[in-house]
From Swiss-Prot:
Disulfide bonds: none
EC category: oxidoreductase
Alphabetically ordered keywords of this record: Cytoplasm, Heme biosynthesis, Metal-binding, Oxidoreductase, Porphyrin biosynthesis
Protein's recorded name: Oxygen-dependent coproporphyrinogen-III oxidase
Gene (name only): hemF
EC numbers, comma separated: 1.3.3.3
Active site (record annotation): 107
Function recorded in the entry: Involved in the heme biosynthesis. Catalyzes the aerobic oxidative decarboxylation of propionate groups of rings A and B of coproporphyrinogen-III to yield the vinyl groups in protoporphyrinogen-IX.
Region of interest: Important for dimerization: 241-276
Claim: Oxidoreductase is one of the keywords in the record: yes
Subunit structure, interactors included: Homodimer.
Record-level Gene Ontology MF annotations: coproporphyrinogen oxidase activity; metal ion binding; protein homodimerization activity
């Protein structure tokens, strides 16, 4: 393992620890259970899952470090010149599904790839981001989420947040329904436009920002009462989350194609979900407001 890879791995393991601790403290009744695993083809990881906490219905914070002799198709599709190279991939990925429909689902990921071939220079890049999926949107929460994202990006250039915000909006879009999965945040891949130290600093800034972005929202909304109807709407919207993760998500596809651990890969799926045939929210309802007002292409910081 190279010095660079060792530094990234140490950071990711520490990030996993810090996020789990912060989520446990905010929940008050949750405890992550760790499941260490090995990958027969090379590598392994530690999956941490929580279920039936006071706030978190189901959540997972995964670390993985896998390697192999050939990049999977999902990793080389956009860079065909790397096909056939050996690879190492390290990352932390998390999804939090709260009980309450007033607390948004959150997702975050930071990852590092390095592709190597004998006699050639290694090719490395970082990827990741974080995004928010509310069920009953609150403008204050959306602005806060994007403000934290903007501040994390600011030291690396004025164009970084707008570029990766737009990429997030484009990526987390259900093409077959022509609708966003949530209100976005940041998404980026193939980050190596800076030198390694700057790129690594950027990834650390994004990883470290997640707790500051998410926990204040959880704290504000976790005690709000909700109805059976609101819970059913949450489960209906969770169906969109499942559709995206199984059809489009690069991390899911990479994990399955690289022979990753299925239980860890599918940990992102919510525990309860529903689909209703051609269901539509009543015009003017809070449920309709989600799609009419929040799940739109918006600049959340323009007037705030």
């Amino acid at each position: 393992m190279s010095t660079r890879t060792e530094a990234v791995k140490a950071y990711l393991l520490d990030l996993q620890d810090r996020i789990c601790t912060a989520l446990e403290q905010e929940d008050g009744n949750a405890h992550f259970v760790e499941d260490a695993w090995t990958r027969p083809a090379g590598g392994g990881g530690r999956t941490r899952v929580v279920e039936n906490g006071a706030v978190i219905e189901k959540g997972g914070v995964n670390f993985s470090h896998v390697f192999g002799s050939n990049l999977p198709p999902s990793a080389s599709a956009h860079r065909p010149e790397l096909a056939g190279r050996g690879f190492e991939a390290l990352g932390v990925s998390l999804v939090i599904h709260p009980h309450s429909p007033h607390v948004p689902t959150s997702h975050a990921n930071v990852r590092f790839f390095i592709a190597e071939k004998e006699g050639e220079e290694p090719v490395w890049w970082f990827g990741g981001g974080f995004d928010l999926t509310p069920y009953y949107g609150v403008e204050e929460d959306c602005v806060h989420w994007h403000r934290v994202a903007e501040r994390a990006c600011a030291p690396f250039g004025d164009d970084v947040y707008p570029r990766y915000k737009a990429w997030c909006d484009s990526y987390f879009h259900l093409k077959h329904r022509d609708e966003p999965r949530g209100i976005g945040g940041l998404f980026f891949d193939d980050v190596n436009q800076w030198d390694f130290d700057t790129s690594f600093a950027f990834i650390r800034a994004i990883g470290d920002a997640f707790i500051n972005a998410y926990l204040p929202i959880v704290r504000r909304r976790k005690a709000a009462a909700y109805t059976v109807q609101q819970r059913e709407f949450q489960e209906f919207r969770r169906g969109r989350y499942v559709e995206f993760n199984l059809v489009y998500d690069r991390g899911t596809l990479f994990g399955l194609q690289s022979g990753g651990r299925t239980e860890s890969i599918l940990m992102s799926l919510p525990p309860q979900v529903r689909w209703g045939y051609d269901w539509k929210a009543a015009p003017g309802s809070e449920e309709a407001r989600l799609t009419d007002y929040f799940l739109t292409d918006r600049d959340w910081l323009a007037d705030n």
